[in-house]
Amino acid sequence: LIDPKLIEETIDVCLHEVMDVFYQKDLGLIVENLSASDNSLVDSFEGRSINPGHSLEAMWFIMDLGKRLGRPELIQRAVEIALRTIEYGWDKQYGGIFYFMDRLGHPQQQLEWDQKLWWVHIESAIAMIKGYQLTGNQKCLDWFEKLHQYMWEHFKDPEFPEWFGYLNRRGEVLLPLKGGKWKGCFH
């Protein structure tokens, strides 16, 4: 078995990296990449990249750790970051959550930046319902219901039970594939 002390140390390191290093307080968001030399923000495609799906996935992991460690303040902080992230990542024109965003609003390097992916929405729904379950925050439940409606209206195949994985910005099926390199049993 793994030494409990190693597990404890790993949890501490991961919490610090996510909540104190990659989370940028002035932005209220988690960034994907920082300078390797000093953990500062970098003005490049990679340095400006925000992936709302990764951030929301990380926040429900953090909520789980907060519960495991008996740290309600950690849960509350994760919920606040999750709410800020989903509000930032939500497409106000067509609905759904963008795949990638640029923290300065510049053009994206990723051509798929405005696609709506199933896993981003599922991870977001988990974060929202978990946030509601652990804190009773009504905003989390409201977002969960909004996500639930969007997912079942857009990702569901009306003929066969498996969801489509990739939608265009307008929420229309982009690829009729139901499985692939990224769409499998993990997501």
Residue ranges of predicted features:
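Glycan-recognition and catalytic cores of secretory/periplasmic carbohydrate-active enzymes
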Residues: 1-187
